[in-house]
């Protein structure tokens, strides 16, 4: 039946895996914040950017979609909301096009389910270079973001016995796939490619000032209740330690304290800290009262 088929070696190029997705810091923060807000359910959104060249996809911004998901799947895209959101973004100066979509996998890694594959197929019908980004907000900790980008493999290549994709890249390293992603069809139904997060000067200044304290932070009143509870626990622990010292008749008390917490010293430090904080809070309360009564 397929006797006349020559295969991908007849001069036709196969899909290249050396593309790189450049995600801006703003887009990455939005994806992580949106994903953490939806835990334990999946959330999804669209990515805005441009196709710079044949090997680069640039993502500059994202916006969330009002879809609700289960712990393993997420609903399809709402086209009405997408059109309204795109018109609003154009009015605010965002003229980028949709380059793909993202969704979260809270706690179970980066891969594509059958529903995700069908959603990606609908995107690739509109644009062959559409990208599906998966982010895990639970496994993503400070300094390491668990994220991956995928694109589908043409099923006809596998049926006809052709090579699904080729790797021709000078990136310099290969990303080792996880076992769960291989089980769910990585390099069989879809493939992964490199992700980079570049920061310009403005984004770098923004990230450096993200948690920077200002003069207004010094006017905030702290939580006094937690300080009191901590002091009460220290008093109870010091009382128990004092009773234990009474029972050490005929023994060296200094040797019994070796390797144990000195609750008396901690209690004195906590008292000095509380006195200083009470003085500051009294001053702040007077300042607030003077400001709001004028």
From Swiss-Prot:
A motif (JAMM motif) lies at residues 103-116. One of its GO terms (cellular component) is proteasome complex. Pfam families: JAB (PF01398). The keyword Membrane does not apply. Acts as a regulatory subunit of the 26S proteasome which degrades poly-ubiquitinated proteins in the cytoplasm and in the nucleus. It is essential for the regulated turnover of proteins and for the removal of misfolded proteins. The proteasome is a multicatalytic proteinase complex that is characterized by its ability to cleave peptides with Arg, Phe, Tyr, Leu, and Glu adjacent to the leaving group at neutral or slightly basic pH. Belongs to the peptidase M67A family. This is 26S proteasome regulatory subunit RPN11.
């Amino acid at each position: 039946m397929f006797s006349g088929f020559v295969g991908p070696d007849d001069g036709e190029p196969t899909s290249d895996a050396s593309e790189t997705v450049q995600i801006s810091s703003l887009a990455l923060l939005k994806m992580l914040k949106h994903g953490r807000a939806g835990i334990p359910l999946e959330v999804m959104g669209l990515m805005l950017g441009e196709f710079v060249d044949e090997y680069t996809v640039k993502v500059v911004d994202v916006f969330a979609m009002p879809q609700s998901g289960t712990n393993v799947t997420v609903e399809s895209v709402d086209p009405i909301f997408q059109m309204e959101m795109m018109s609003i973004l154009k009015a605010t100066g965002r003229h980028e096009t949709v380059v793909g979509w993202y969704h979260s996998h809270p706690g179970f890694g980066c891969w594509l389910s059958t529903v995700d594959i069908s959603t990606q197929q609908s995107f690739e019908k509109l644009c062959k270079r559409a990208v599906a980004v998966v982010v895990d907000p639970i496994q993503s900790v400070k300094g390491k973001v668990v994220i991956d980008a995928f694109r589908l493999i043409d099923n006809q290549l596998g049926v006809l016995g052709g090579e699904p994709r080729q790797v021709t890249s000078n990136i310099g390293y290969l990303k080792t796939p996880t076992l769960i992603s291989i089980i769910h069809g990585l390099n069989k139904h879809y493939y992964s490619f490199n992700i980079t997060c570049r920061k310009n000067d403005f984004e770098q200044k923004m990230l450096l000032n993200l948690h920077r304290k200002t003069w207004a932070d010094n006017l905030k009143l702290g939580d006094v209740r937690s300080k009191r509870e901590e002091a009460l626990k220290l008093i109870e622990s010091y009382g128990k330690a004092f009773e234990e010292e009474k029972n050490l008749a005929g023994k060296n008390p200094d040797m019994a304290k070796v390797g144990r917490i000195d609750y008396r010293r901690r209690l004195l430090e906590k008292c000095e800290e509380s006195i200083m904080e009470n003085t500051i809070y009294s001053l702040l309360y007077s300042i607030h009262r003077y400001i709001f009564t004028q």
